[in-house]
């Protein structure tokens, strides 16, 4: 039994708490799970209004493309009677590879493509110039591993559909992405003359995988059985968020409400939350599996990924051999784009733009 006893002081826990605050301030972000952006009601209403306009316009265009009138859109693109490719850049930083893309676009006719940029408004970026000038669409905040990336892609699709009825393919491009071929090579690949002559339906180039070791955890990231009845586990798919969709599939994406109600829900398990890699493959696999190739045209290297990010290429790795290697695939087609490149790769890439990248 102690000889002396001291009364408990209320100052001790108070002092302990005060001393702990600086520690929590500095270590908290590394201990607590990061907060994910959610879809706000105003943003949802803005998107629905945009989608409805694009859907109404698409459904009113039942005539063959050759009967479409020549029009000038609010983004300044002039419609002609040849199908176009809509290049949709999704970025939260400067477009570091704009000079390389400028060469890509300047080597072809301007009436064969349109450019759209979704730039996170919370981040200040340099105003794009050249063919990219005035191409930023009304944008919202985005965050990796959140439904905001799905919203941004849908926003780009709807804007491009509304802007020009001759946008026939819609390619989603990252700011870390580079072209691997010339524009004319890509255009010839997508609008194959044999398909045109036979009046065949075009296919969407989107990766759709049904097997993955992490698929179950990602399916239940919002809670067990939350995805049902809209999406059962055997319908859940995964794939690259960067795709090249046909117009009919772009329409299906912006028409969807059923699956979106589930994919926009916040995740409980944020470590397994990558909705942007599941929404599009799952939706199109359920809606039109035969209309999709199930592979992407964007090459990415996952051999030494870090925190869910693919391998990043740096200047010492950039060479003609790398470009040739990145083009190769396991199928009969060639990859058209590649990521992820660090901004300082621009100079070595520009040095071999004409002699390697755009020499088909």
Regions found by a protein language model. Name each.
Residues 1-360:
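ER/Golgi luminal nucleotide-sugar-dependent glycosyltransferases, focusing on the catalytic module
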């Amino acid at each position: 039994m102690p000889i002396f006893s001291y009364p408990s002081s209320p100052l001790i826990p108070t002092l302990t708490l005060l001393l702990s605050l600086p520690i929590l301030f500095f270590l908290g972000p590394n201990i607590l799970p990061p907060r994910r952006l959610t879809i706000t009601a105003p943003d949802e209403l803005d998107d629905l209004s945009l989608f409805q306009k694009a859907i109404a316009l698409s459904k009113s265009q039942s005539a063959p493309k050759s009967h479409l009138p020549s029009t000038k859109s609010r983004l300044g693109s002039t419609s002609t009677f040849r199908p176009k490719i809509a290049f949709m850049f999704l970025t939260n930083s400067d477009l570091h590879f704009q000079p390389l893309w400028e060469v890509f676009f300047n080597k072809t006719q301007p009436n064969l493509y349109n450019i759209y940029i979704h730039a996170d408004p919370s981040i200040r970026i340099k105003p794009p110039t050249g063919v990219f000038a005035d191409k930023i669409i009304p944008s919202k905040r985005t965050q990796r591993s959140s439904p905001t990336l799905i919203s941004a892609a849908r926003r780009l699709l709807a804007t491009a559909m509304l802007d020009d009825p001759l946008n026939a393919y819609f390619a989603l491009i990252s700011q870390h992405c580079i072209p691997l071929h010339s524009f004319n090579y890509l255009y010839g690949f997508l609008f194959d003359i044999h398909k045109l002559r036979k009046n065949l339906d075009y296919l969407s180039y989107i990766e759709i995988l049904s097997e993955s070791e992490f698929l179950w955890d990602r399916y239940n990231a919002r809670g067990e059985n939350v995805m049902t009845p809209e999406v059962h586990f055997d319908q859940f798919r995964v794939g690259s968020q960067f795709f090249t969709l046909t117009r009919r599939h772009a329409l299906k994406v912006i028409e969807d409400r059923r699956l979106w109600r589930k994919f926009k829900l916040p995740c409980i398990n944020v470590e397994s939350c990558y909705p942007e890699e599941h929404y599009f493959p799952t939706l199109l696999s359920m809606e039109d599996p035969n209309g999709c190739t199930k592979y992407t045209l964007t090459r990415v290297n996952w051999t030494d990924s870090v925190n869910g990010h693919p391998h990043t290429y740096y200047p010492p790795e950039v060479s003609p051999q790398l470009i040739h290697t990145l083009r190769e695939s396991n199928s009969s087609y060639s990859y058209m784009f590649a990521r992820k490149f660090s901004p300082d790769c621009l100079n070595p890439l520009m040095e071999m733009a004409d002699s390697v990248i755009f020499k088909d």
